[in-house]
From Swiss-Prot:
Heme binds at residue 439. Transmembrane segments: none annotated. Keywords: Endoplasmic reticulum, Heme, Iron, Membrane, Metal-binding, Microsome, Monooxygenase, Oxidoreductase. GO terms for molecular function: arachidonate epoxygenase activity; heme binding; iron ion binding; oxidoreductase activity, acting on paired donors, with incorporation or reduction of molecular oxygen, reduced flavin or flavoprotein as one donor, and incorporation of one atom of oxygen. It is found in: Endoplasmic reticulum membrane; Microsome membrane. It holds the Pfam family p450. It comes from the Eukaryota. Liver. This is Cytochrome P450 2A8. It catalyses: an organic molecule + reduced [NADPH--hemoprotein reductase] + O2 = an alcohol + oxidized [NADPH--hemoprotein reductase] + H2O + H(+). Belongs to the cytochrome P450 family. CDD domains: CYP2A.
């Protein structure tokens, strides 16, 4: 009895020492982290962060603490990187140490670390390598996907002609077109524009994407451990994601029934074949959960980001009609009114290219960027960032860095034009992020945006119910994503 009592005391003493040492080490590390406002227990810096003006709050903190600072999203610390220099030093110069995915509470709640976008470590590396190779096989970066994009754009042009110049909301017109391009790769087919299930899926994507940028979405990022047990619209957003997963699961079942291992038809087939090849590997990352989540990643990201950018671009071109007029002029000179635009035309159209880049810079569709996580304790500048710390590359601060863009808050294509009117690249053009976890859909997105804008503007002029000076381009939401204000417009045949 005495021996067992002494053993218990020893065990408890050892545990106490370990806990004290762990707390001491954590506090020691926190003291060496980048500066920031003092957090309160549990709520962190909630009182300093206005969820409706999240970016503005961060901007003020940057003025006080410098380009590398720490905030506490609820109880968890997060390092914010502000401006090109800080983001480049972290994501490029220390790419491997920042190659894990940071915490994105809502998506982590749903994806649980599966899928190519929200996974880390070896899982992320294998899925990313496979996804890039497979998408390339199905035309990524080649004429195959360009031909699909051109074909899909022809359906859009006809749909816009059928409006007969009426005032419409362009949202679902663009999301249907963009989504059909990625659908042809991951599902092997496109959807008819009046397909009710397709329209339902697009609604699910849009609503869950917008939820992330609402005040409730920002609160969930800070207090998810509590809020996922409370009533609220976070549960509806979760159901939207579940609806998307259910649809993909049905698609996978269809492919399984008709699979020919020697002739993959789409991304799902290729993944199923890889699953069969590795079924005896106990450590394989090619299993059903990763198939569902990776396909959902591609379908979601391949639909909403380009659709939002294009829609926002329409609004900007209506506010600045002189810019649209110069694009029309260049399109007529280089392509004409009858020939179908091709992506190779962008090499001969410096003004149009500059406008499309400026739209992406100004729209800034994912302002904070997706967070990274440190794979080990790292030294960054004069600071120590502990392993597992979330690091946000604030992409908006790079895209609006005054060192690279003379008037960063103005919409001005001259940001991407030299003195001779030729297209000028910028190292600070990072809407797709950089480093080990950059968006591998970048080449597809650039090609899509060029084909969409040139083909639509070859055929139509844009008209707003409002005078240009009255058009408000302030985003409806600006935190996780930049969501344009609701607007209507007319597509008038040229």
């Amino acid at each position: 009895m005495l021996v067992s009592g002494m053993l218990l005391v020893v065990v408890l003493t050892c545990l106490s020492v370990m806990i004290i040492m762990s707390v001491w080490r954590q506090r020691r590390l926190l003291r060496k982290m980048p500066p920031g406002p003092t957090p309160l227990p549990f709520i962190g810096n909630f009182l300093e962060l206005d969820t409706e003006k999240f970016y503005d709050c961060l901007s003020k903190m940057r003025e006080r603490y410098g380009p590398v600072f720490t905030i506490h999203l609820g109880p968890r610390p997060a390092v914010m990187l502000w401006g090109y220099d800080a983001v480049k030093e972290a994501l490029i110069d220390q790419a491997e140490e920042l190659s894990d995915r940071g915490e994105q509470a809502f998506f982590d709640w749903f994806f649980k670390g599966y899928g190519v976008v929200f996974s880390s470590g070896e899982r992320a590396k294998q899925l990313r390598r496979f996804s890039i190779a497979t998408l390339r096989d199905f035309g990524f970066g080649k004429r195959g996907i360009e031909e699909r994009t051109i074909e899909e754009t022809s359906f859009l042009i006809q749909a816009l002609r059928d409006t007969n110049g009426a005032t419409i909301d362009p949202t679902f017109y663009m999301s249907r077109t963009v989504s059909n391009v990625i659908s042809s790769i991951v599902f092997g087919n496109r959807f008819e524009y009046d397909d009710k299930e397709f329209l339902s899926l697009l609604g699910m994507i849009m609503r869950s994407f917008q939820f992330m940028s609402t005040s409730t979405g920002q609160l969930f990022e800070m207090f998810y451990s509590v809020m996922k047990h409370l009533p609220g619209c976070q549960h509806q957003a979760y159901k939207e994601m579940q609806g998307l997963e259910d649809f993909i699961a049905r698609k996978v079942e269809e492919n399984q029934r008709t699979l020919d291992p020697n002739s993959p038809r789409d991304f799902i087939d290729s993944f199923l074949i890889r699953m069969q090849e590795e079924k005896k590997n106990p450590r394989t990352q090619f299993h059903m959960r990763n198939l569902l989540m990776t396909t959902l990643n591609l379908f979601f990201a391949g639909t909403e980001t380009v659709s939002t950018t294009t829609r926002y671009g329409f609004l900007l071109l209506m506010k600045y009609p002189h810019i649209a007029a110069k694009m029309h002029e260049e399109i007529d000179q280089v392509i004409g009114r009858n020939r179908q635009p091709k992506y190779e035309d962008h090499l001969k159209m410096p003004y149009t290219e500059a406008v499309i880049y400026e739209i992406q810079r100004f729209v800034d569709v994912v302002p904070l960027g997706l967070p990274r996580s440190t794979t080990k304790d790292i030294k960054f500048r004069d600071f120590l960032i502990p392993k597992g710390t979330d690091v946000f590359p604030v992409l908006s601060s790079v895209l609006k860095d005054p060192k690279f863009f003379s008037n960063p808050n103005d919409f001005n294509p001259q940001h991407f034009s030299d003195d001779k009117g030729q297209f000028k690249k910028s190292n600070a053009f990072m809407p797709f992020s950089v480093g080990k976890r950059y968006c591998f859909g970048e080449s597809l997105a650039k090609m899509e945006l060029f084909i969409f804008f040139t083909t639509i503007m070859q055929n139509f002029c844009f008209k707003s119910p409002q005078a240009p000076q009255d058009i408000d381009v302030t985003p409806q939401y600006f935190s996780f994503a930049a969501i344009p204000p609701k607007f209507t417009m007319s597509f008038l045949p040229r």
